[in-house]
Amino acid sequence: MSLPLSLQTLVKKTVASQCLSIDEHCILKHCGLWWHDVPLKLCMDRGQIQIKSGFLGEDIDLHIALIIAVKENNYSLIKLFTEWGAHINYSLLSINTEHIRELCRQLGAKETLEDDDVFRIFTKIMHNKTSGRIILCHDIFMNNPNIENKFTIQLRGLICKRLWGLIEIKETDELNDLLVKYWYAKAVQYECKDAICFLEEKYTDLNEWRLKCLLYFNKIYELHEMYHKEKVQIDVHDMICLASTKDNNPLTIYYCYALGGNINQAMLTSIQYYNIGNIFFCIDLGGNAFEEGRAIAEQKGYNFLSHSLALDIFSSDASLPLNLKDPEEISSFLKDYKSKNLSIIWEYSHNIL
């Protein structure tokens, strides 16, 4: 299908224009180059066509724009985005009427999407961790009958990799539940406040999951707010272990230790996940579970760690105050802190190599 010459000219003008006059807006509306109350514009980013449109607050990939247009049953934009180069098979992810399905067939769409295609779309949308992307991903994938059991194995693998130590995935876990937890965790990690509010309005049982995410992503200020002011609490020993499953989490490890968390348990958890920064920070705080830690390291084949923990060269750091409980004070003190015991093991390793 070819575009009318006047539309071709208008598209070129839209692509090239940075600022459009009110008169031009009227023309754009008349010609269908208008979406969600703003002008529709094209731009290029690293050789990829992007749609500049205001409703997400950011540019979106042309293929993703097609998925949205199909979900909205927007016939004219489906055709336009396809003419501009959008892969018509992506439409299969959001088709919700037989009329749209027939249109997409006419434009060359297959009958079904491959698992790899679905997973590729998911990762493409989630590439930029913003509130708009998280909410969009939720709108497209949540309770989507076009997906059925597609890409479940790949998605489980992705969540397990990105949230290693934070979540245990069981075979009985529902896909929708895993998706909500993944999106919420990403919203907490990247401080996407609109997405957090959006998900909390839809799902009312996220308080404990949020606390776990704050521990995992080293968010001490929000953790303090939830624990002391909102009174969302779990066992402090579980908290310090969870903080230890992701490396370089001194803020939340210290915070939980100040609350009474077992620093040796944190040390052993850090060893289990091979989190070097956490291990030696725990020793700085007084952790001394060397024999148990060495046994775990040997069992897992962590040879360097097993050898290191057998050395009699470590001790707690006397310069570390052990009674700070205010997140501002903890953050300020640890901002430029260099682990005493990590420095010792690096120096030892350098000398023997």
From Swiss-Prot:
Q: Which GO terms describe its biological process?
A: taxis
Q: List the disulfide bonds.
A: none
Superkingdom of the source species: Viruses
What single Pfam family name could you report for this chain, choosing any that match? ASFV_360
* Family classification: Belongs to the asfivirus MGF 360 family.
Q: What does this protein do?
A: Plays a role in virus cell tropism, and may be required for efficient virus replication in macrophages.
Q: What is this protein called?
A: Protein MGF 360-13L
